[in-house]
From Swiss-Prot:
Family: Belongs to the UPF0145 family.
Protein name: UPF0145 protein BceJ2315_57450
Gene3D superfamilies, sorted: Hypothetical protein apc22750. Chain B (3.30.110.70)
Position of the signal peptide: none
UniProt source species: Burkholderia cenocepacia (strain ATCC BAA-245 / DSM 16553 / LMG 16656 / NCTC 13227 / J2315 / CF5610)
Alphabetical list of InterPro entries matching this protein: UPF0145_dom_sf (IPR035439), UPF0145_YbjQ-like (IPR002765)
Length: 122
């Protein structure tokens, strides 16, 4: 289903933005912060493989893959929470991460859950 055919009752990734408003839409209600948190650890095997990659330099693909999966999971959890709040869009979306222990990283995705309507003339 394309974004133009999707009901404004539905929250889709296409209506998530890092901007403070959604182009072509008017915010009619702010519902609060929606967030998704994922805590991931590296396996011993993964850490060993990544250590080998550091010998040669360049992109450490094992860690890149782990980070991408964690961000995707945090994003999906944020969308689910925003849906529970009744949102059909999220504005001011951000990611943050923190190492909370040796080899353990928290990834958070958060934004303001809102209800939007098509702007007049848009």
């Amino acid at each position: 289903m394309t974004e133009s055919n999707r009901s404004l009752d539905d929250l889709s990734p296409a209506r998530v933005t890092t901007a403070f408003d959604l182009p072509g839409h008017t915010t009619v209600r702010s519902l609060g912060v929606a967030q998704g948190i994922v805590v991931r650890s590296r396996s011993i095997v993964g850490s060993f493989g990544a250590s080998l990659q550091t010998i040669f330099g360049g992109n450490i693909t094992l860690y890149t893959s782990l980070c991408e999966k964690a961000r995707e999971q945090a994003f999906d959890k944020m969308l689910a929470e925003a849906c529970k709040l009744g949102a059909n869009a999220i504005v001011a979306m951000r990611y943050d991460s923190t190492e909370i222990g040796s080899g353990v990283t928290e990834v958070i995705c958060y934004g303001t859950a809102v209800q939007v309507a098509h702007a007049a003339g848009a």
